[in-house]
């Protein structure tokens, strides 16, 4: 099984470069700030729909810059 994880450090760098906050991103993605926090800390993994929203809201950011694909055994692909 393949899992997709958010690269939280990269996301935070991207937000800093854009001078935007996690709350701004949560608002633009139409999710709660609590859910955004869970995505960033790794408590939750982004669904395909959430991944699509990240890429739409953070226009110009590549998939591989934000997400990491892992096999169920934890290895990176």
For each predicted feature, which ranges?
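Short, Lys/Arg-enriched C-terminal cap helix and immediately downstream tail that follows
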Residues: 11, 48-49, 63
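Short alpha-helical "recognition helix" segments of helix-turn-helix
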Residues: 25-26
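Recognition helix of helix-turn-helix/homeodomain-like DNA-binding domains
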Residues: 31-45
């Amino acid at each position: 099984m393949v899992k997709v994880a958010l690269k939280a450090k990269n996301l935070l760098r991207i937000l800093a470069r854009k001078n935007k906050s996690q709350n701004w991103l949560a608002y633009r993605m139409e999710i709660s700030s609590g859910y955004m926090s869970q995505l960033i800390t790794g408590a939750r993994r982004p669904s395909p729909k959430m991944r699509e929203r990240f890429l739409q809201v953070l226009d110009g950011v590549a998939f591989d810059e934000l997400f990491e694909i892992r096999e169920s055994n934890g290895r990176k692909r």
